[in-house]
Each structure stands twice: as structure tokens, then as C-alpha cells.
């Protein structure tokens, strides 16, 4: 991939930082240990990585003022190097830019609006009464059912399925193979037979939401499933019907959230955590990876950890038997 030369002076301005030397140029972004003498890198402050900072071959390192003495190369001082990294990743993203067009193989239903500023790739199917905003990009194989709305500047990657009546806000990104608006898991037991409950709600997604590959967000039974502004969802996440995920919550991969649970604003949910249904999780809660949440959390800003350490199988059996004996004593 061809690299573009970037001015350190201009980068420092974009990062709201101060460069150690003017007139330098860099051609790429890389980690401290892999950077070459034409690259820029960053040091987020983790002392475990100090040897990488000391020995890096990078031309320029973005770091905090406190870490200057460990750096043997030129640098840009900023308040938050990791946030600066997010800006650098945008500057050095050299992937091919999209030219607006609608490919011939696209199928568009009745009364659907596709602006000329949008990019609609091969074999996309768009249903009836669909409203697509300006500068939207939709990649091959996407299926959009009737009465869907997609806001400006959103990106829908390959093979995503968006079910009827779903609303997606502006500046959202939905990655490959995600499914939005499938039926929630609702059944009523009639004697010995499970009878399906039709899911009559939909899914409403706010602005600046990211949804990872192979994630599923179920439509509500009656009310809508809601994903508010700024939520970031990793790959293979399951969100059940009627859930509300509040603003700026971030959810790591393989998390399962059962139906009708409300997650507060600014929560952090670690990978493979399990959250049972009909719960309320207070804002700014952190849930550690692998933790099962079985009751509501009412304290703001706390961290909850509930995973059990693993053992060799023979030791696990001993621990299990010990716990059983303890239980008999308590009962």
C-alpha cells in the first residue's frame, strides 16, 4: 500500500500537541516495536512498554510530557496519547476512497429514496419505502427490508441484514454479517408446546453507533429495542428484545444481554459477560470479562467481577466437592 507523506507540524496542530522539532515528515503509523525510521508511533503511558519506547526506531513518538526523558527520538507532547492515536489512525487510513454510485445489480423497491451521494455496491437488495441518507455506503450482499431508515454518513458492510421498520441514525457503522431487527426470543408455554409470540416492535439505533460483525440485535415484542447515541458494540454480541443500551456504553465481544434489560450511560461490559433479563444496570458500571450479572445494579460507577478461577480438572472436582460439603453445613 502506498504511503502518504505527512507533516509533523500539521499533525501536532491536529493533535493539539507540541512537536520537539519542526519541519519533519513521516510516512506511516506503527507500534513502537515495529515502527521504522519513517513512521510515527505513540506511547500511552503503560510502564510495561517502556523498553519499547526506549528502543523504538520511530521517527516521532506521541507521548505525555512526563515520558519525554525515556524517548530517544523526536516527539509530540499531548495530554492523552491514546486519544491522539485514534486521530492518527484516521490521518493514516489509506484505504481506497469510495466514489458515489449505485451498481447495476442493486435491487431497489417502490418509493425508496437513494441519494446520488450514496455508494450502493453489488447485489444489495433494498425494500419498499426505504429512506437512505446522504453519503451512505452500503457494501455487497446487504439486505434492507421495507420501511427502514438509514441516516447520513452511515456505513453498512457486507451481508448485513436490516429487518423491517428499523431506524439507524447518522454516522453509524455496521460491520459484516450483523443482523438488526430479527424477532426476539419470545414463546408462551401451552401445556407441553411452545407457542411463538410475534415480535411487533422494532429497533431504533442512535447516531455514532458501531455494531461489530456477526452481532444480533432483536426487535422488541411490543416496545422498541433502543441503542442510544455513541454506543460501541464488538463482534458476536447478542442483545435481546426490548433492551435499552444507553449513551456511550461500550460492549466487548461475545456478550449476551437478555431481553428487557436497561443498561445505563457510559457502561463498560467486558468480553463474554452475561447479563440476565429484566434488569437495570446503573450508569458508568464496569462489568469484568466473563462475569454473570443476575440482579440489578443500583450503585453508579462500580466495577463488578464474578468469574471463577479455572483449575486442572482433578482440582476442579475437589473444589466442587468441597463447596457441596460447605453447602450441606450451611443448610
What are these language model-derived features?
Residues 36, 151, 204-206:
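Residue-level recognition of short, solvent-exposed, well-ordered loop/turn junctions
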Residues 158-331:
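Glycine-rich hexapeptide-repeat left-handed beta-helix
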Residues 99-165, 169:
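Right-handed parallel beta-helix
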Residues 1-105, 166, 171, 177-178, ...:
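Terminal amphipathic alpha-helical/low-complexity segments used for targeting or macromolecular assembly
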Residues 1-20, 130, 136, 237-256, ...:
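Short N-terminal secondary-structure initiator segments
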